[in-house]
Amino acid sequence: MDQDEALTTVDNIVTQFNTYEDFLDSQITTLDLYYLEDEGLARQLVELGYRGTGEVVKREDFEARKAAIEIARLAERTQKKTLTSAGKDLHDNFLKALAVREEDNRSGKSVIFIRDKNSHGQEVSGYIDYAHRLKTEDFEVYFSGKKRLLPRPTDMSFYNWDSHIAIWNSTPNYQVIADNPEGLLFKYKRDRKILNVDPKAQPGDNSTRSPILTELYTQVVIFDHVSRRKT
């Protein structure tokens, strides 16, 4: 038997049996148990090749192939992971804009500015690291319309216009520069480019500013950044 045939045989066995012990048991006959009177001993003899009705497969080969097949299965499932926005009937421009950017933001691309009233009727605004929020919460509730995406005190920036509370937080993708005399800046950590969110200024290298007309919020602006750094 050549190497390819041997590998195919092991793969077939690994696919058929959950554990190595299950495979050994399949090779033991009723007659073996009658004469040996010990299931453990019967398994050992099959493993050593002295008993059995089929191919001899070493424990380490079985477990190695089992692990490799599982890793490949998980990798394939990750690659085929359905986007949260997939299949949703989205009518509002903001939700459509989020859906278009969802796949890119699995690696960190966009900053979302939102201004609107919270559940207490207070006006709040802030900048959201879209990629970070995607990783830390389920966006199903937003795309399905069950909840509205709003800035939180844990986002890149948060401001409550009633209480005048202002909070800034750096994220895995962006460093907040809050002490800039000309206004708030964000530095993209991957390529260290500056994103300027001042509406009167250019957003910066490799960045675009897109105001979104939406019926869900008072104001929405999405900043998209394209990293030129090789990864």
Curated annotation (Swiss-Prot):
May be involved in spermatogenesis. PANTHER family: CILIA- AND FLAGELLA-ASSOCIATED PROTEIN 299. Its main location: cytoplasm. GO terms for cellular component: cytoplasm; nucleus. The keyword Calcium does not apply. The keyword Cytoplasm applies. It comes from Bos taurus. This is Cilia- and flagella-associated protein 299. InterPro entries: DUF4464. Keywords: Cytoplasm, Nucleus. It is found in: Cytoplasm; Nucleus. Pfam families: DUF4464 (PF14713).
